[in-house]
Amino acid sequence: MDPTSRPAIVIDNGTGYTKMGFAGNVEPCFILPTVVAVNESFLNQSKSSSKATWQTQHNAGVAADLDFYIGDEALAKSRSSSTHNLHYPIEHGQVEDWDAMERYWQQCIFNYLRCDPEDHYFLLTESPLTPPESREYTGEILFETFNVPGLYIAVNSVLALAAGYTTSKCEMTGVVVDVGDGATHVVPVAEGYVIGSCIKSIPIAGKDVTLFIQQLMRERGENIPPEDSFDVARKVKEMYCYTCSDIVKEFNKHDKEPAKYIKQWKGVKPKTGAPYTCDVGYERFLGPEVFFNPEIYSNDFTTTLPAVIDKCIQSAPIDTRRALYKNIVLSGGSTMFKDFGRRLQRDLKKIVDARVLANNARTGGEITSQPVEVNVVSHPVQRFAVWFGGSVLSSTPEFFASCRTKEEYEEYGASICRTNPVFKGMY
């Protein structure tokens, strides 16, 4: 059967989580932590020159090579077994362990999606600052190991913009604020093309919010088991956190009416099974505040997210700036905090308006600058924006014509994966 008649497979590999499913669906079929548990016990066996011992070690190595788990199964296995070590293939948006990444894809395709890779075209995502060599490695693994008929590697920011376009009827010109678990990127896109020289990234992302909440609760002396503290902080972030408009007023509200604003987390200790409770107070608004006042978390980076977005747009070509300010699209789970988009739009609008007023003052009122419209777009599929954008675009006929095929790979080599064309469905 012709692979183009089957739905393409869309896999969005993130630092924290991987989303995977079939083109045409609204939501991914599976969302798994991007982690691999590998049995490395054979490495600790004593080395010996005897043939029998070597054969034993070799057989153990082969068995261990096949004995691995991914996602939640990997996390559970590492807790229950001392022989399995965790490997995180992706760090800060970049693949660092290609062996673990190949194993991860293997399980995704055969164990979860349960499909034959030779029967489907594939769309994979990458970070905006990914080097071309990384695309070549991806192409080699997909074409040689899995023998896929076609592959398209898309920049996740373009897919997020496509998701905003589909749900909000916006242009394919805009700024994507992609806040993932391990990296935050601000990417300007003009008519489907990334303006590479203007990409900005900041070293604060979803995992940093979790670590900050964990630190706050630890300093307050909450009764949380050490081995469970990170997971509790992550769940507190996802369930209770919100973005406030004024941090001082928020402190006052919590102090005046603690019963109204302080929540209680109930958990079970992993080792003993005994129940425990802890209070969740200032963490609810201080967690997301690191994007707007980063100095409360780290002295190494103090530039706010609105200032980074403004700097990104100001470095773009002058004829695209108004369109970029008008379409700022949010993407990623860490943009899902309540009122995050509203706070971002307000703070960015202040920066832009202050520049306009300063410009008018410099000209003495002889030349008046036109107001700049600032619009931050939130949409229903914001959390899975990258995957949903890939699902929509890989459902179009133009997608199959734009993919790098197995025949092209065999003729020209992995270098064909260095670039992927923008196709008509993107704009």
From Swiss-Prot:
The keyword rRNA-binding does not apply. Keywords: Actin-binding, ATP-binding, Cytoplasm, Cytoskeleton, Developmental protein, Nucleotide-binding. Gene3D superfamilies: 3.30.420.40, Actin, Chain A, domain 4 (3.90.640.10). InterPro entries: Actin, ATPase_NBD. It holds the Pfam family Actin. GO terms for molecular function: actin binding; ATP binding. It is found in: Cytoplasm, Cytoskeleton. SUPFAM superfamilies: Actin-like ATPase domain. GO terms for cellular component: Arp2/3 protein complex; cytoplasm. Its main location: cytoplasm. One of its GO terms (biological process) is actin filament organization. Disulfide bonds: none annotated. Signal peptide: none annotated. Disruption phenotype: Distorted trichomes and altered epidermal cell types. Expressed at low levels in roots, seedlings, leaves, stems, flowers, pollen, siliques and at a higher level in inflorescences. Belongs to the actin family. ARP3 subfamily. Functions as ATP-binding component of the Arp2/3 complex which is involved in regulation of actin polymerization and together with an activating nucleation-promoting factor (NPF) mediates the formation of branched actin networks. Seems to contact the pointed end of the daughter actin filament. Arp2/3 complex plays a critical role in the control of cell morphogenesis via the modulation of cell polarity development. Involved in the control of cell morphogenesis in leaf epidermal pavement cells, root hairs, hypocotyls epidermal cells and trichomes, especially during rapid cell expansion. Component of the Arp2/3 complex composed of ARP2, ARP3, ARPC1/p41-ARC, ARPC2/p34-ARC, ARPC3/p21-ARC, ARPC4/p20-ARC and ARPC5/p16-ARC. Interacts directly with ARP2/WRM, ABI1, ABI2, ABI4, BRICK1 and SCAR3. Interacts with ARPC4. This is Actin-related protein 3.
